[in-house]
Regions:
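Short amphipathic alpha-helical segment within the helicase RecA-like ATPase core
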Residues: 1-213
Length: 213
């Protein structure tokens, strides 16, 4: 999985399979959602009024919006703006990642880390984003006769203003390292005890030491 930033184009001009924008309950738009709404002649506000409550963990896919180059706009519910914290942000990123995986997309762009939330920095939110995506992509098939279908999602871009690229990139790098570590731990935990023996764990530890000296 490749994580990187996108800052070279206006949101409505980004060509991507899916662009995630966050919206709060009570029809409150994030700055990114407002940009897309203006570029699409109010399409986002119309949907919020009629069919999307924006509860945390929910999403709605809009296709072929006028004035928008992204194939899909994925509205991601953030819940109540006053209660939006790191946990809700991670849920939002996970919701979008699961959608992209289920839709078998190869790449996607998210604006979710750019949404301010209480007690966090952009770096922390970027780290949380990478962790959420890697967690969503975890599959265990090491001991199964039928292997899990390969995840097609290989590139996850985070849209941020140019002035914030370095902070975002640092967070993505941090989150990638943590996410890979968590997934490796999950793999070990999922292995049967006749395979994941103390000797096997010691061998894995030695290999990690060689890979990450």
């Amino acid at each position: 999985m490749e994580f990187s930033t996108q800052s070279s184009a206006s949101l409505h001009q980004i060509k991507t399979s899916a662009l995630a924008i966050g919206v709060f309950t009570n029809q409150v738009l994030t700055p990114a959602a407002d940009i897309i709404d203006r570029a699409s002649n109010g399409a986002i506000r119309k949907v919020l009024k009629s069919e999307f409550s924006a509860k945390s963990g929910s999403h709605l896919v809009l296709r072929n919006l006028e004035g928008i180059k992204a194939e899909r706009i994925v509205l991601v519910g953030l819940g109540d703006q006053d209660k939006y914290q790191a946990a809700q942000h991670k849920t939002a990123e996970s919701t979008f990642a699961h959608y992209c995986i289920q839709a078998k997309l190869s790449e996607a762009v998210s604006t979710l880390a750019g949404v301010d939330c209480n007690g966090t920095t952009l770096r922390q939110r970027s780290s949380g984003a990478a962790q959420a995506v890697l967690a969503a992509s975890y599959r265990f098939d090491a001991t199964l006769s039928t292997k899990a279908e390969a995840i097609k999602l290989s590139k996850y871009l985070q849209w941020v203003p140019r002035t914030l690229v370095s902070e975002s990139k640092a967070g993505l790098d941090e989150g990638t390292a943590i996410g890979k570590g968590v997934n490796f731990t999950r793999l070990l935990a999922d292995l049967p005890p006749n395979i994941c023996t103390p000797t096997y764990l010691a061998e894995q530890a030695k290999q990690l030491g060689k890979t990450y000296p």
